[in-house]
From Swiss-Prot:
Gene Ontology CC annotation, any one: cytoplasm
GO biological process: response to arsenic-containing substance
Cystine residue pairs: 10-82, 82-89
Family assignment from sequence similarity: Belongs to the low molecular weight phosphotyrosine protein phosphatase family. Thioredoxin-coupled ArsC subfamily.
Active site per the UniProt annotation: 10 (nucleophile), 82 (nucleophile), 89 (nucleophile)
Keyword Glycoprotein: no
Origin organism lineage: Bacteria, Bacillati, Bacillota, Bacilli, Bacillales
Function in brief: Catalyzes the reduction of arsenate [As(V)] to arsenite [As(III)].
Protein name, entry field: Arsenate reductase
GO function term, MF aspect, one: protein tyrosine phosphatase activity
Localization of this protein: Cytoplasm
E.C. no: 1.20.4.4
SUPFAM superfamilies xrefs: Phosphotyrosine protein phosphatases I
Source organism (scientific name): Macrococcus caseolyticus (strain JCSC5402)
Gene: arsC
Keywords assigned: Arsenical resistance, Cytoplasm, Disulfide bond, Oxidoreductase, Redox-active center
């Protein structure tokens, strides 16, 4: 069976979408191709890398990328992770489903916020797998 494509989008492709891509590949990698991107690029946040390393997932090789129209238009599901991305997501073809899963932005906040948001994203992806 061909894998489906899941595209996580947030503002800067720095924290939330990077962690979601890491979790997604870890949890859904056998059935989904998982990517992430941003409306802008802010670089991968080192604390996001460290937070994911803490749960055994390596995202240190990830890059901060702008939305790729080819991936976007060929996705089965696009998930926005912040209201900015939800409001500014490009128009999608009718075959692409879109969902919004809002998470707080941990950037510039305490380490515990990175851990909390990381765990919330992981839980959401675990729940998604059960659908």
């Amino acid at each position: 069976m061909e894998k489906k494509t899941l595209y996580f989008i947030c503002t800067g492709n720095s924290c939330r979408s990077q962690m979601a891509e890491g979790w997604g590949k870890h949890i859904l990698g056998d059935t989904w191709n998982v990517y992430s991107a941003g409306i802008e690029t802010h670089g991968v946040n080192p604390k996001a890398i460290e937070a994911m390393r803490e749960v055994g997932i390596d995202i240190s090789h990830h890059t901060s990328d702008l939305i790729d129209q080819d991936i976007l238009n060929n996705s089965d599901l696009v998930v926005t992770l912040c209201s900015d991305a939800d409001n500014n997501c490009p128009i999608l073809p009718p075959n692409v489903k879109k969902e919004h899963w809002g998470f707080d932005d941990p950037a510039g906040k305490a380490w515990s916020e990175f851990q909390r948001v990381r765990d919330e994203i992981g839980h959401a992806i675990e729940q998604f797998k059960l659908r």
